[in-house]
């Protein structure tokens, strides 16, 4: 079973309108929860300033204020694959979180795999993030 996990901003009420706004903005990820609970996954862009502003999935951000991307694992031993414009730029096994630097403008996203499940599930993504757009 695939599930869409919608991210609603903390200052917004949990209602139909904020739900629709979050989906329109791309503030969500897809989790194949039949393979395990994906609640708690996170993929954000982190700003350069002192406040380290966070840019969530679906956000558009200029390249200049962006220092890194961070992804949070929901369990140890997961394989994360980072993409830019559809091509793989980074792949690693993660126990809690990982970060990588943006490589210029483009469309960035991550996929998470559970290699511990073995074939055929280790070849299909468990979590698919929505992209962050770097302009």
Regions found by a protein language model. Give the residues of each.
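C-terminal functional module detector
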Residues: 1-135
């Amino acid at each position: 079973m695939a599930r869409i996990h919608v991210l609603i901003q903390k200052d917004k009420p949990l209602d139909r309108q904020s739900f629709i706004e979050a989906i329109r903005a791309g503030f969500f990820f897809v989790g194949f929860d039949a393979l395990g609970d994906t609640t708690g996954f996170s993929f954000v862009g982190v700003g350069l300033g002192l406040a380290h502003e966070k840019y969530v999935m679906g956000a558009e951000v200029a390249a200049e204020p962006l220092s890194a991307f961070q992804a949070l694992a929901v369990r140890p031993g997961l394989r994360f694959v980072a993409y830019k414009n559809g091509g793989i730029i980074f792949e690693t096994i993660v126990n809690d979180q990982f970060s990588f630097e943006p490589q210029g403008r483009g469309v960035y996203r991550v996929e998470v795999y559970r290699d511990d499940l073995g074939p055929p599930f280790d070849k299909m993504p468990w979590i698919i993030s929505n992209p962050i757009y770097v302009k």
